[in-house]
């Protein structure tokens, strides 16, 4: 016996299932396998599922059909009594193996133990199938191997069961009635030999063949198991007196014989094991001993193959001897000599009790510990830690809706449900006219047969400006899409989603999924007069696509149509995206707005609709459904993300699935079986017991077929008669359609929202669908099955420690079934500590003044209604969990009462008038670092104590301080330093705290400085932040400097005095007194220094002149002679430090300049800065002169007290300053006030970081939603044309001519594809498309660059004209020789190359040639890159005249040749005399670069002579054509761009303030094609044209002193240079909508442009019905005669409405007088007056901008001036959309 005192382990695998609920055990395994704490369990279950799938697939078809589809083993366990049928043995064997190994693996993972039984004395034993489970452990060294090996055990178990059943059924067929008969009995009280005698006697006397004999399969001391075919067994026991009267019982062995050596042989074993299909290596070694149930000894197997062969042999042919097993185990344990014995098993059994009794009897002194491997599965492990996205639960965190009957938000929707209201009505007049479109008899074609429906109030209400839509776009956009945007926003707002705030809110990971099943608006309302936005506003995909576009979500965007289930199907698809990892946050919902009577007619004809009213769900009189509007949106993310993001979780989605009723009797008929399949799928996915579901929201349409089938499917799965529900398991049902009707595509989302609200309100609202009695097709035993259709409001409490499970159903008329399973949100830990902030920030914003005012008022009202609201939570919600807009108010308050007062003041008219929009660009920020004069004890104490980031930063810096040999500065912060700390400690504390504060501002709060300035000691922190010094070097230098001052200077011998006077005043008063200027802080704030005695004397003199003097509380006189002794030593210290170039500019008070380079600041600089004065005022002035700082710059004082801030305010009175800390003020109070100030200035802090350290201590509040500035955009359906079309007749022959697709191969570098070609007798039409991003086209464009952008030059349009002209003319008149005169070229908008890579930028060209006029017209169009649609209006037009007689041109030019040559000779002469400028090629194009940067191949001018607006040049064309052209653009440009050089380079032009661009020319003619081998000259004289800002001239092209070409009436427009960025930029390129280029110029618009994107529709945020303006197409006649309303004010005022205050604005003669304009309106009017040359008094409200001379160019200038000078972001189209001064004043008052 070994001398070993280690613990020994016995693991026993039985052959019986535990007595627990088997399905419940498998649900536990599946549910826990989704948690990453049970990775090996998951791996085992997945591998087992795969091997079972493979084995099932190998079965014959009849057997395969018996097995349901399964993704996990759970459906197999839920088959019911799987013992029935030919696969009973296989299923029982496999499931027992899965259960035992799964419980084994899970137990060890739950205990957190690394399973390594090889280090212990471990032995394994098992009985029957348990041996196979034990084999999985015997072959393993760790849990991961158990998972792999276990799958092989499952495979063999399944095969064993299949084989045994197959063989046994050949011995005796099963009972016809399905009765299960046992193949084994246990006999007790008799010996094995006695029983064997009886069996032998029976087998012999009955003549039973050996194959069918009755035999002993197992034996022990007290019992014997007898096996055989059931009928033979029965006969044997009947014939034997011994057996008939013995104590015996049947074993649950129903599928055949094992342990039968007479039946099976070696081939049988090989068939079962089938090693060739093994999923593990057959040579894998055996690691642990496994006892044979026959011999009791360990199997003598060395490999997996040998072990499975031995087990297979024993199971098929070996007799079980329990006594041998017990003896073998005892001997094994004795061999280990253990100190204790660990026994692990699965519950208990008769066999295990015998084993245990034997062990306790054999080892009475041994501690035996029995471990059950089952209970771990029932423990609560807290929130699931999903091992992958697919195993996450999902959290619904936001919701919003527009429901019928006034359910315009979720609270109002709940009121409808809680009050049990039925909201159906007749069809409102704004949808269609019931008097003409309703016929209950059904005789009128296309008429509705029911007048009823459920409708959203005023679905046209929309805040167009908020969503950057013009009124016309809003009007044409389907209200479904509009309200999808609105509810998406409201749901996101409720969820506190700020894009980019967290990983799960990364915009690229947010997707949208919306269900929609109809197109009423597009097909009816908008189609009456199809407009620009017919496609983008009506096609379904744009509904969710617009949400992605507006919010800039690059994630997935899907529009889902599954008929009536679309809304919930969209939720399911969205959930699937989360589970698949395709998105991290999803918006999902359903949309339905009814306007089209056609759908009423169609549904009526199909007998879908009730003619009596509302949906009567489960009522006996149910006769169809009642249609309904509905819009709903929800925000869903993975549960773990929601918890990490501190979201409010409304409910949790466990699973969701969709299938189809494919087996129904018709496509619209439901199918109970398919519905049940879907239910089982969701409960299996969630591993939920269906009996635990306590509420089901029915689809419940109120149709006879639908209600009957749904009741059957629901009850069969969730309330079966067996097993029945317990008394405490009441299942309650309801259907929202009985309240709000059937919302079709929105029905599912309405049901979903109802259940979410139930979770919120803890109540099940009454089902009001039963009007008479319950439908007789519904099962009668609802009460017996514990099912109730709740007809009263019923509490639905959440019990402690439990979760309510609910299910939502939604079925589509096409057959789709969607089901979602939900449970309660996790209970939130409310014991998280929060930092003690004395003051809190609260901010509110909006996009319009009216919305802002309403938002303020709504919050104030909310505070009144919720007096217990937590101020910290409110701060967190409004700051960190809201998107912030340009109109802002903010408060730093310490109480709710203080906030109420602040809101009251902010909501006053005067206060709102002062609110200005924050600038579009973040203002520059300068950090100012204060010097030692700001020192005090307890600096930043509150931040250090409770702001973890700041504390950690300080401690890291203090660690550096101490490692450098200095004393810790922490005592300065906590106040424990004592009185009069050393200069070293005080100065280092300043530097350290300022560095920490700077990091707080930059890294945490998001303030990125554009420059830094340090005052005296503060410069060390500034240099660290600017990257010149490392943190360690900065601290080292500051500390050593302080030590040297303490060492070399005497404290108190010198002093510093702050004097409220200028340097010159002080000098004048003090004369020759001894003092030094230490600091010049402002023009009238100077610090002087010197000996104490000298300063006392100076102070007396100054104060005697009434000049205020304040001693500076410092022990030394810095920047004076007192520090001279330290300079040499400090120099040596500083020279050891490495200085780097600044990463941001440094405003230097020493140099009074701004430092950008890496050489200026060095050791010498620091020495000078120590000794020389601090010229703070001079430094600021230098930064102002450079334009680095101005009135808009935001200054952050980074120091203990805002000393620098006061200096900045004095130097720049309008400066916006913020401070970090303030002496004698709580840090949080200071921080809060200044964060709000920065926020209002447009420097939005990273609010999330301000709360992040203790975010879990804050609660996201549900606050009033954003107050929309709504207008009712509605196109009313006019007339009866949906009825009339039923009577239209078609002749079918007279249609438009068919356009024959072109087979032409016209393709050049600029013309890429013909998309349409029509050739007639005398006319021809050609439509082509070109991609500007094509390499050859792009090269031509980039040859002409403006503002670093490639801009298409007019020579490109010229070549395209010549190319198309030649092509079409040859088509109509082949072989004809003509000359082409390109003319009337007018380019309205520039074409700028999009800088994005791998994009397309298509242009359309339409050309029409008429031989009768010998003229071709051309028009160029942009293409919308998103839709591929051609723009409605062209951006360029031109023509080509075909002239056969070129002699006319020659004659014309010969008369002019001598004049042109004479002017050239004159210019040559003037150049020789110095009166004209002679420019080389290089100089000419360098001068051109002022506006245009030409590529080398465009540079054809060799020499230029220019005087004022006249010039000629010598030209040499580059030889390369560089592509396929008619005439290369770079050649055309070379011979013609002399005119552009004159305008943009001549001394006569004001090129500083303006640049010049060409909108085109009247004609371009060449007698012969340009030739690179020919030398040319060009001559032009430009002159002003009568049209304002326009110049023109004729440009002549000469060859050998003969005119051979001409650009006639070449025009140029003067454009303010400040518009360069607007016209020529990457943004302009992407929009393709700029107004001018070197080849195009702005033109006065002939049509109104859309409203500015920032302009919301003009209406009160909460309009009353009587005052609500309505936007609708003014259709009073058939659609083709519709006259559109005025775009500028569409929907804002009807003709009957008077403008408020109109009567008061009229003067005595009825003329309109100018009201006094103040604030931003007054500033804008003054600016307009300055630019237009008008008097402000002339800008009366009725004055139009056309009258004032504001054309499109001037409007661009004004919008740019508004931005630059007033900080207002307005679009130039404002002056078109607001045609009068009064209109514009109204707009400014509202939005600025």
From Swiss-Prot:
Residues 1-395 are annotated as: N-terminal acylcarrier protein transacylase domain (SAT). It comes from the Eukaryota. One of its GO terms (molecular function) is fatty acid synthase activity. Keywords: Acyltransferase, Phosphopantetheine, Phosphoprotein, Transferase. Residues 1312-1447 are annotated as: N-terminal hotdog fold. Residues 1475-1621 are annotated as: C-terminal hotdog fold. Disruption phenotype: Fails to produce asperthecin. Residues 391-824 form the Ketosynthase family 3 (KS3) domain. CDD domains: PKS. Residues 1634-1716 are annotated as: Disordered. Pathway: Secondary metabolite biosynthesis. The keyword Acyltransferase applies. Residues 1634-1649 have a biased composition (Low complexity). Residues 926-1243 are annotated as: Malonyl-CoA:ACP transacylase (MAT) domain. Binds 1 phosphopantetheine covalently. Its cofactor is pantetheine 4'-phosphate. Non-reducing polyketide synthase (NRPKS); part of the gene cluster that mediates the biosynthesis of asperthecin, an anthraquinone pigment. Catalyzes the formation of the aromatic polyketide from acetyl coenzyme A and seven malonyl coenzyme A molecules. Through its product template (PT) domain, catalyzes the cyclization of the polyketide backbone via C6-C11 aldolcondensation. Polyketide is subsequently hydrolyzed from the NRPKS by the action of the hydrolase aptB into endocrocin-9-anthrone. Endocrocin-9-anthrone is then oxidized into endocrocin by aptC. Multidomain protein; including a starter unit:ACP transacylase (SAT) that selects the starter unit; a ketosynthase (KS) that catalyzes repeated decarboxylative condensation to elongate the polyketide backbone; a malonyl-CoA:ACP transacylase (MAT) that selects and transfers the extender unit malonyl-CoA; a product template (PT) domain that controls the immediate cyclization regioselectivity of the reactive polyketide backbone; and an acyl-carrier protein (ACP) that serves as the tether of the growing and completed polyketide via its phosphopantetheinyl arm. This is Non-reducing polyketide synthase aptA. It comes from Emericella nidulans (strain FGSC A4 / ATCC 38163 / CBS 112.46 / NRRL 194 / M139) (Aspergillus nidulans).
């Amino acid at each position: 016996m070994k001398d070993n005192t280690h613990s020994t382990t016995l693991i026993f695998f039985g052959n019986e299932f535990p007595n627990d609920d088997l399905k419940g055990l498998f649900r536990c395994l599946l549910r826990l396998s989704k948690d990453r704490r049970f990775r090996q369990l998951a791996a085992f279950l997945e591998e087992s599922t795969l091997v079972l799938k493979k084995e099932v697939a190998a079965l014959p078809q009849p057997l395969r059909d018996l097995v349901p589809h399964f993704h996990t083993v759970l459906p197999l366990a839920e088959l019911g009594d799987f013992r029935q049928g030919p696969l009973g043995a296989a299923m029982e064997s496999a499931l027992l193996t899965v259960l035992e190994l799964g419980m084994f693996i899970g137990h060890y993972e739950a205990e957190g133990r690394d399973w390594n039984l090889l280090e212990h004395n471990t032995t394994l034993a098992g009985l029957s199938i348990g041996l196979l489970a034990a084999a999985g452990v015997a072959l393993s060294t760790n849990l991961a191997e158990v998972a792999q090996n276990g799958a092989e055990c499952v495979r063999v178990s399944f095969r064993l069961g299949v084989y045994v059943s197959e063989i046994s059924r050949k011995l005796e067929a099963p009972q016809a009635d399905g009765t299960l008969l046992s193949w084994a009995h246990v006999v007790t009280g008799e010996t094995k030999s006695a029983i064997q005698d009886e069996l032998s006697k029976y087998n012999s006397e009955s003549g039973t063949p050996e194959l069918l004999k009755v035999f002993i399969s197992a034996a022990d001391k007290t019992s014997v198991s007898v096996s055989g075919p059931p009928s033979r067994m029965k006969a044997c026991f009947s014939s034997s007196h011994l057996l008939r009267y013995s104590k015996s019982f049947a074993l649950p062995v129903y599928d055949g014989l094992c342990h039968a050596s007479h039946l099976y042989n070696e081939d049988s074993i090989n068939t079962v094991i089938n090693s060739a299909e093994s999923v593990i290596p057959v040579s894998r070694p055996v690691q642990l001993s496994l006892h044979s149930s026959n011999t009791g000894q360990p199997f003598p197997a060395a490999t997996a193959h040998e072990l499975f062969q031995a087990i297979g042999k024993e199971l098929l042919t070996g007799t079980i001897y329990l006594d041998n097993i017990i003896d073998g185990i005892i001997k094994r344990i004795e061999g280990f000599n253990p100190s204790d014995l660990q026994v692990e098993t699965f519950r208990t059994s008769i066999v295990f009790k015998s084993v245990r009794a034997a062990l306790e009897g054999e080892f009475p002194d041994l501690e035996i510990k029995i471990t059950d491997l089952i209970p771990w599965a029932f423990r609560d492990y807290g929130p699931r830690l999903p091992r992958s996205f697919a195993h996450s639960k999902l959290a619904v965190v936001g919701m919003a809706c527009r429901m019928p009957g006034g359910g315009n938000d979720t609270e109002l929707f709940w009121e409808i449900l809680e009050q049990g209201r039925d909201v159906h009505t007749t069809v409102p007049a704004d949808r269609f006219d019931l008097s003409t479109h309703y016929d209950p008899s059904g005789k009128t074609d296309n008429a509705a047969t029911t007048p009823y429906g459920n409708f959203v109030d005023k679905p046209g209400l929309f805040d167009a400006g908020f969503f950057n839509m013009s009124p016309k776009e809003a009007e044409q956009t389907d209200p479904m899409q509009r309200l999808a945007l609105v509810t998406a926003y409201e749901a996101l707002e409720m969820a506190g989603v700020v894009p980019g705030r967290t990983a799960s809110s990364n915009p690229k990971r947010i997707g949208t999924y919306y269900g929609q099943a109809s197109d009423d608006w597009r097909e009816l309302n908008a189609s009456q007069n199809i407009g620009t936005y017919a496609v983008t506003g009506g096609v379904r995909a744009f509904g969710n696509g617009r949400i992605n576009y507006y919010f800039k979500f690059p994630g997935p965007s899907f529009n889902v149509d599954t008929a009536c289930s679309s809304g919930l199907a969209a939720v399911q698809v969205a959930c699937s995206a989360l589970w698949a990892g395709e998105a991290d946050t999803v918006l999902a919902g359903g949309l339905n707005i009814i306007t089209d009577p056609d759908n009423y007619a169609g549904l009526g004809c199909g007998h879908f609709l009730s003619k009596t009213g509302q949906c009567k769900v489960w009522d006996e009189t149910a006769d169809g459904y009642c249609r309904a509007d509905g819009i709903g949106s929800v925000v869903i993310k993975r549960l773990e993300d929601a918890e990490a993001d501190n979201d409010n979780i409304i409910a949790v989605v466990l699973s969701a699935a969709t299938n189809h009723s494919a087996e129904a009797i018709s496509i619209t008929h439901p199918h109970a079986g398919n519905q049940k399949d879907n239910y089982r799928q969701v409960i299996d996915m969630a591993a939920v017991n269906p009996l635990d579901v306590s509420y089901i929201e029915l689809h419940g349409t109120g149709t006879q077929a639908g209600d009957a089938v749904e009741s059957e499917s629901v009850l069969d799965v969730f309330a079966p008669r067996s097993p029945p529900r317990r008394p405490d398991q009441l299942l309650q049902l309801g259907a929202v359609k009985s309240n709000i009707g059937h919302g079709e595509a929105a029905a599912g989302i309405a049901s979903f929202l109802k259940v979410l609200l139930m979770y919120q309100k803890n109540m099940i609202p009454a089902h009001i669908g039963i009007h008479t009695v319950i439908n007789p097709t519904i099962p009668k035993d609802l009460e017996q099955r514990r099912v109730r259709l709740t007809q009263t409001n019923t509490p639905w409490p959440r019990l402690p420690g439990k979760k309510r499970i609910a299910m939502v159903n939604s079925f589509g008329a096409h057959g789709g079934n969607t089901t979602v399973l939900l449970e309660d949100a996790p209970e939130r830990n409310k014991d998280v500590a929060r930092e003690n902030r004395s003051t809190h920030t609260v901010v509110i914003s909006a996009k319009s003044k009216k919305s802002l005012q309403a938002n303020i008022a709504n919050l104030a009202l909310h505070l009144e209604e919720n007096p217990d609201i937590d101020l910290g939570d409110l701060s967190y919600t409004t700051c960190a969990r809201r998107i912030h807009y340009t109109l802002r108010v903010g408060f730093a308050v310490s109480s709710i009462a203080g906030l109420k007062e602040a809101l009251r003041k902010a909501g006053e008219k005067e206060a709102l008038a002062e609110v200005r929009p924050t600038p579009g660009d973040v203002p520059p920020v300068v950090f100012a670092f204060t010097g030692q004069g700001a020192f005090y004890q307890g600096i930043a104490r509150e931040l250090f104590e409770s702001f973890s980031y700041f504390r950690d930063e300080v401690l890291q810096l203090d660690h550096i301080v101490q490692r450098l040999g200095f004393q810790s500065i922490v005592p300065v912060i906590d106040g424990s330093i004592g009185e009069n700390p050393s200069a070293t400690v005080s100065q280092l504390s300043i530097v350290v705290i300022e560095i920490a504060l700077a990091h707080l501002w930059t890294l945490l709060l998001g303030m990125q400085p554009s420059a830094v300035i340090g005052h005296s000691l503060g410069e060390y922190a500034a240099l660290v932040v600017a990257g010149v010094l490392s943190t360690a070097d900065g601290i080292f230098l500051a500390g050593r400097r302080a030590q040297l001052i303490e060492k070399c200077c005497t404290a108190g011998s010198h002093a510093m005095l702050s004097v409220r006077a200028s340097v010159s005043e002080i000098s004048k008063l003090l004369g020759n007194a001894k003092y030094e200027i230490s600091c010049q802080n402002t023009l009238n704030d100077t610090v002087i220094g010197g000996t104490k005695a000298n300063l006392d004397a100076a102070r007396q003199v100054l104060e005697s002149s009434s000049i205020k003097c304040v001693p500076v509380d410092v022990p030394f006189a810095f920047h004076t002679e007192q520090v001279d002794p330290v300079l040499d030593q400090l120099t040596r210290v500083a020279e050891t430090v490495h200085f780097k170039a600044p990463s941001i500019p440094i405003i230097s008070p020493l140099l009074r300049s701004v430092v950008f380079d890496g050489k200026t600041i060095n050791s010498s600089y620091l020495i000078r800065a120590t000794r020389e004065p601090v010229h703070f005022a001079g430094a600021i002035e230098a930064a102002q002169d450079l334009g680095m700082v101005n009135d808009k710059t935001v200054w952050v004082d980074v120091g203990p007290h805002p000393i620098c801030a006061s200096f900045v305010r004095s130097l720049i009175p309008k400066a916006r300053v913020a401070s970090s800390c303030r002496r004698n003020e709580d840090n949080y109070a200071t921080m809060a006030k200044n964060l709000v100030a920065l926020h209002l200035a447009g420097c939005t802090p990273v609010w999330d970081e301000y709360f992040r350290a203790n975010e879990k201590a804050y609660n996201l509040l549900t606050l009033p939603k954003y107050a929309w500035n709504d207008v009712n955009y509605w196109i009313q359906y006019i007339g009866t044309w949906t009825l009339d079309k039923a009577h239209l007749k078609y002749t079918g022959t007279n249609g438009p001519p068919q356009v024959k697709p072109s087979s032409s191969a016209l393709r050049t570098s600029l013309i890429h594809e013909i998309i349409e070609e029509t050739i007639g007798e005398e006319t021809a039409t050609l439509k082509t498309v070109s991609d500007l991003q094509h390499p050859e086209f792009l090269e031509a464009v980039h040859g002409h660059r403006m503002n670093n952008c490639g801009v298409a030059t007019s020579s490109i349009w010229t070549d395209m004209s010549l190319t198309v002209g030649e092509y079409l003319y040859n088509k109509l008149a082949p072989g004809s020789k003509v000359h082409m005169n390109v003319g009337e070229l007018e380019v309205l908008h520039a074409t700028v190359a999009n800088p994005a890579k791998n994009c397309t930028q298509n242009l359309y060209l339409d050309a029409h040639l008429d031989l009768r006029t010998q003229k071709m017209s051309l028009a160029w169009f942009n293409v919308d890159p998103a839709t591929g649609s051609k723009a409605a209006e062209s951006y360029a037009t031109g023509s080509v005249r075909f002239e056969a007689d070129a002699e006319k041109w020659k004659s014309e030019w010969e008369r002019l040749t001598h004049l042109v040559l004479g002017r050239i000779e004159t210019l040559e002469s003037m150049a020789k005399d110095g009166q004209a400028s002679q420019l080389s090629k290089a100089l000419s194009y360098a001068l051109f670069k002022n506006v245009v940067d030409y590529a080398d191949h465009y540079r054809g001018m060799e020499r230029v002579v220019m005087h004022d607006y006249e010039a000629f040049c010598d030209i040499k064309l580059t030889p390369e054509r560089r592509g396929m052209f008619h005439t290369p653009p770079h050649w055309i440009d070379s011979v013609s761009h002399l005119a552009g050089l004159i305008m943009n380079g001549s001394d006569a032009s004001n090129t500083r303030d303006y640049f010049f661009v060409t909108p085109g020319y009247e004609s371009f003619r060449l007698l012969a094609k340009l030739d690179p081998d020919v030398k040319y000259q060009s001559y032009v004289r430009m002159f002003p044209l009568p049209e304002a800002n326009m110049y023109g001239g004729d440009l002549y092209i000469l060859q050998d002193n003969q005119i051979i070409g001409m650009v006639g009436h070449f025009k140029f427009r003067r454009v303010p240079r400040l518009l360069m960025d607007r016209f020529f930029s990457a943004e302009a390129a992407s929009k393709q909508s700029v107004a001018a280029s070197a080849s195009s110029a702005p033109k006065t618009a002939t049509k109104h442009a859309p409203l500015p994107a920032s302009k919301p529709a003009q209406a009160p945020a909460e309009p009353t019905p009587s005052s609500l303006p309505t936007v609708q197409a003014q259709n009073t006649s058939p659609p083709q005669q519709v006259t559109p309303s005025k775009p500028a004010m569409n929907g804002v005022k009807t003709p009957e409405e008077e403008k408020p205050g109109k009567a008061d604005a009229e003067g005595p003669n009825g003329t309109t007088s100018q009201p006094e304009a103040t604030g931003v309106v007054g500033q804008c009017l003054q600016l307009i007056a300055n630019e237009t040359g008008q008097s402000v008094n002339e800008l009366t409200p009725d004055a139009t901008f056309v009258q004032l001379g504001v054309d499109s160019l001037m409007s661009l200038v004004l919008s740019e001036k508004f931005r630059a000078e007033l900080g207002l972001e307005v679009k130039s189209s404002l002056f078109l959309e607001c045609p009068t001064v009064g209109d514009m004043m109204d707009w400014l008052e509202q939005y600025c």
